[in-house]
Amino acid sequence: AKLGERVGVSESTVVRFATAMGYEGYPELQAALQELVRQRLTASERFNIASEIKENDVLRTVLKNDMRNIRMTTEDLSQKDFDRAVELLLSARRIYVMGLRSAAPLATFLGHYLRLIFDEVVMVQNTIGEVFDEVERITATDVMVGVSFPRYATRTVDCMHIARENGARVIGVTDGAMSPLSVVADVCLYAHTDMASFVDSLAAPLSLLNALIVALSLRRREELSARLRRLETLWNAHGVYVDRGDERLGEPKA
């Protein structure tokens, strides 16, 4: 009704317009427009939105926002797409993982665990030269995982296109069907990242990657179990982790 008033037409005209655009109704059109605007918000605009949060309620607001993102991701995620991503990764000769800017921690997390599960995992580096040097080697027997959320990293999208042109399968981890990753990926896994500030909410994407890693580990159970036993021996021999009884932990605080 408010949109009709603003543009000087009736509510029924707005509904017919939404239907003519291919939407089931105005609410669906409204949601699509909101998503489009959200993707285009600059960091400063996102920060201004955060100013509406009361300072004494920041903790609860942000945590509730992250919980909502995880819940919505759980409800919306396609099990079929998730299963297909698992199969593509299991069939790959080599796996390339790429995520830049705020998505870099997600890509690093995924790459770390994929290297425990698979022998051939390449983390595509962040410098311009190294990015294209790595991606140029991708072949039709490989799989690339591109991770990016608003505002999308141009180089990630470009490298996904190169991988696709080289015949590789491409998996996108992003926020929705309007993402540029959806255009190039063979399969996309969507996670909600609605933010309460200029900071990207990575709670749902991280949970999604957790699920992907666990699914892969269960399919490679025997190989992974043997590798972890060998690694534990090396880790213990070289003191990779601080032991609970290590004096470096210090005395417990009263």
Where are these regions (language model features)?
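A short, basic/flexible loop-to-alpha-helix module at the beginning of a structural domain
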Residues: 80-87
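Short acidic/histidine-centered micro-motifs embedded in hydrophobic/aromatic stretches
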Residues: 32, 36, 88, 231
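Glycine-rich phosphate-binding loops that contact phosphosugars or nucleotide phosphates
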Residues: 87-208, 213-220
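A short, charged, Gly/Pro-tolerant segment at domain boundaries
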Residues: 222-254
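HTH-adjacent hinge/linker in prokaryotic transcriptional regulators
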Residues: 2-80
